[in-house]
Amino acid sequence: MANRPAASALAGARSPSERQEPREPEVAPPGGDHVFCRKVSGVMVLSSDPPGPAAYRISDSSFVQCGSNCSMIIDGDVARGHLRDLEGATSTGAFVAISNVAAGGDGRTAVVALGGTSGPSATTSVGTQTSGEFLHGNPRTPEPQGPQAVPPPPPPPFPWGHECCARRDARGGAEKDVGAAESWSDGPSSDSETEDSDSSDEDTGSGSETLSRSSSIWAAGATDDDDSDSDSRSDDSVQPDVVVRRRWSDGPAPVAFPKPRRPGDSPGNPGLGAGTGPGSATDPRASADSDSAAHAAAPQADVAPVLDSQPTVGTDPGYPVPLELTPENAEAVARFLGDAVDREPALMLEYFCRCAREESKRVPPRTFGSAPRLTEDDFGLLNYALAEMRRLCLDLPPVPPNAYTPYHLREYATRLVNGFKPLVRRSARLYRILGILVHLRIRTREASFEEWMRSKEVDLDFGLTERLREHEAQLMILAQALNPYDCLIHSTPNTLVERGLQSALKYEEFYLKRFGGHYMESVFQMYTRIAGFLACRATRGMRHIALGRQGSWWEMFKFFFHRLYDHQIVPSTPAMLNLGTRNYYTSSCYLVNPQATTNQATLRAITGNVSAILARNGGIGLCMQAFNDASPGTASIMPALKVLDSLVAAHNKQSTRPTGACVYLEPWHSDVRAVLRMKGVLAGEEAQRCDNIFSALWMPDLFFKRLIRHLDGEKNVTWSLFDRDTSMSLADFHGEEFEKLYEHLEAMGFGETIPIQDLAYAIVRSAATTGSPFIMFKDAVNRHYIYDTQGAAIAGSNLCTEIVHPSSKRSSGVCNLGSVNLARCVSRRTFDFGMLRDAVQACVLMVNIMIDSTLQPTPQCARGHDNLRSMGIGMQGLHTACLKMGLDLESAEFRDLNTHIAEVMLLAAMKTSNALCVRGARPFSHFKRSMYRAGRFHWERFSNASPRYEGEWEMLRQSMMKHGLRNSQFIALMPTAASAQISDVSEGFAPLFTNLFSKVTRDGETLRPNTLLLKELERTFGGKRLLDAMDGLEAKQWSVAQALPCLDPAHPLRRFKTAFDYDQELLIDLCADRAPYVDHSQSMTLYVTEKADGTLPASTLVRLLVHAYKRGLKTGMYYCKVRKATNSGVFAGDDNIVCTSCAL
């Protein structure tokens, strides 16, 4: 609509004959009147209408429907005088039409009478906040409104008006709005308005300009139909405001606040003249209460000297002090605002923002050497967070006057996070906002780029430092482009600050380096370190693959940076911590097989090879099969394992990144029963207890063949245990060769024979009680390896059971990891396979750079690493992607998507590895020995494999046979427990463990809700039904299936199942569907639930393990997690050890 005049309250409403036709809405100029309210307490209508600003109180604001501490717009002005409630609509008096335009709400109109008004009525439209927007007022160009009405009687004093009203300049100037930085004045549109303006000028002695205060993020241009004020009783007459985005600090929206009474003869304020108008000192109608309120609003006497002491700094007429952040100025403004900050917690932020803006005009552009300082954008980001929290009706503490310093701003953010953290269990919005506050807290500990690059604790690579200096200007521009506040203002995607509280805390507590005593590298600096190093070490062939040409360092930097910062690709934890530094240890997984046969040799291997790996925080899979010299009544391996247990505990005690070790044995080892009893309550005596290490069984097919015979009803099925003297060759063979040798030893009467069900029960009991042993299938691993291992069979895996490598006394298996975030590939419920291919390609290039540049802790590790160049590209967020697409893991659509994703990942990874060889890189050392040399693929050994990209596979086959592959193995599906937290997605390929993750530590409770579920609940329920639904979920451990059993099977909420709600055989089948395209293995956890009586039948786990064996998996069980029958949580084994190496 065209700009309409501000309707003078003294000018009555136009008659129906004078109404004009509605006009098209248009953006109004900045400015406008505000209404502030506090929950359902009184509402103050503030007018900037000449001849003098005045405030009018609406005593009952229940009809406003505006929530807590909202900022609303008045499209026009209101009549001078007192507004009081009107029970019924009448045709006399002034009206205030208040429109509720919140999302989903219908417009509502409240009619309020203007006391003592004798002229026609006038209306004022008040628009509340729209969903997702925070509104600032916009003024209207004055327009003649008819004859002036007789001034109304003076209003009675309003209790809180003095606290948010305008303040008079400390030197006696005109009264200004709090926080105003610019003046605004509408030219008179009629003689009567001109006279009023002149009269106002005489009263105040400083002109008729009015200034505004605002503390919200968004600006709005209010629109109204020209005839909307003709009938305030009609809902249809109230039109929503048109929202115009602008930065909250770009300038105020004009608002005139009521003049406080100022003592004209006060010795403490010698230059202050007496105010005029209702409630002023010269107004004989002012009451004693009004006088007291006005006096309380006056600045203190010590404000003026502050002004005089800083003559070179610009002074904002809305504040009694210069726009310079000093303790004296901040305290003066705090006294100036008084108790108003209790109603408007962010009131101090506008002063901080104005000061920061003034400072930015004086400082040069940011460089590497620029000292970190809080900027206008930082205060704006905090203000955005506070405004969002106020929309949630939270009672916020006021921003302290010293919060302009990094330390006190950090303390204030911490107070908010700790205070409201428990509420994130029911609010996805609050979960996101608290994450923003943690990122702001990180910002307060940021150092300059120069300090960061020179830090000994960070210890940047020399070559990287030189490259960063060469591109200083570009990096500063990129840093500003990724400013979170700018991204919020311009609706630019910034997934970093959108990921939520857990993501931000994980960055702060774990991934960001500390240096210089109290500094912390920023998230931008961390990803600059990683991407910059990758760009430095990228070869010419890699640049051609990534960019399609020979690009520059800066182009390669951006290629990696954006995919890392956006979490399309995620490095492993050691890579994220060490890439770009001179600590070049980035490998995650180590497979060690010392083949020691004596106690002394085993101890040397543990204290030498194993200890060196632990010192570099590597996760270890240790094969102990060869050490098997038990004598009757003793366990040969347990003393050595006790040494290993103590060694792991010692390394983890002072480490910020704990690691672990897993001991692999075959089930015929003479000490297998002792190992199954070495953890937790199963440990018979302290000398046998090993709570800091894990165990895993390397199961041959023969064991399950016999177990199935027992389950089918066959009697007296046995299993034999052998010691070293009779079993030296068993570990070297697999398949039929192993079975022949094993049965031959039995036939000769060697070994100890036990019922097979006894050992099966011991395995299941240990798994259900301690979470381990892990179970891997020896024959499946060796059967699908890239070359024949008969006679030197692979004897173990890594700590998390997803890496497949041969290892021996001379060579240890080593793998470098990375993962792709599948949830980032979903857009509008569609999976983008093009983005997936791009992410896998980038991940393969990243891991190859890691392989080229990493150091190894031992010669054995270096030998195995260089010979095979093995990588493990994993996935995270599979379940999150499924939910974002509106699918269920049980659906046929997802079963197809699951296989499709796995095939694309392997295809893209192998094509990239082959492209490196095409561009001149040498194939891995054992390529000619591998099945790839003959043109065979991993998936071709699976009868259920049906690739959909047969043409691409055939082209790759020909190129692979001609040029080779740079890497020996590609896809390994690890848990991604740590990195999934900073991505804020589900771990690996597993379903969500729970819809509300809760962990209590000495630092408090950590909560991570399923935000997709919370949003779906809000779409489904409302009001009390929503609260009831969440109460039910709380009572049922956030299991939708148990809390809301009455939902229709097709209801969208039915999709939000936890891992325990799914049939575990289905999860095994999903792993089997992916298996042809996973050339390493999958860390498959089983989730089982106790029966109502608190028991867990052994047959439950046995049945699942047999099913995994029959489906041909390599990993039968990583963890076994048990949901207790009572509401006491989930037992997942001993969590004193957290693998952050292989688990990413």
Swiss-Prot record:
The record marks 589, 815 as: Important for hydrogen atom transfer. Residues 1-33, 118-324 are annotated as: Disordered. It is an enzyme of class 1 (oxidoreductase). Residues 192-204 have a biased composition (Acidic residues). Residues 141-159 have a biased composition (Pro residues). GO terms for biological process: deoxyribonucleotide biosynthetic process; DNA replication; release from viral latency; symbiont-mediated suppression of host apoptosis. Substrate binds at residues 573, 588-589, 619, 798-802, 975-979. It comes from the Viruses. Residues 119-132 have a biased composition (Polar residues). Residues 16-26, 164-179 have a biased composition (Basic and acidic residues). The active site is at 798 (proton acceptor), 800 (cysteine radical intermediate), 802 (proton acceptor). The keyword NAD does not apply. The record marks 1118-1119 as: Important for electron transfer. Ribonucleoside-diphosphate reductase holoenzyme that provides the precursors necessary for viral DNA synthesis. Allows virus growth in non-dividing cells, as well as reactivation from latency in infected hosts. Catalyzes the biosynthesis of deoxyribonucleotides from the corresponding ribonucleotides. The N-terminal region confers antiapoptotic activity in differentiated cells such as neurons and is important for viral reactivation to increase neural survivability. Prevents host necroptosis by targeting host RIPK1 and RIPK3, thereby hampering the formation of necroptotic RIPK1-RIPK3 complexes. The RIP homotypic interaction motif/RHIM may drive self-assembly into homomeric amyloid structures and mediates interaction with the RHIM motif of host proteins RIPK3 and ZBP1 to form heteromeric amyloid structures. This is Ribonucleoside-diphosphate reductase large subunit. It comes from Human herpesvirus 2 (strain 333) (HHV-2). The gene is RIR1.
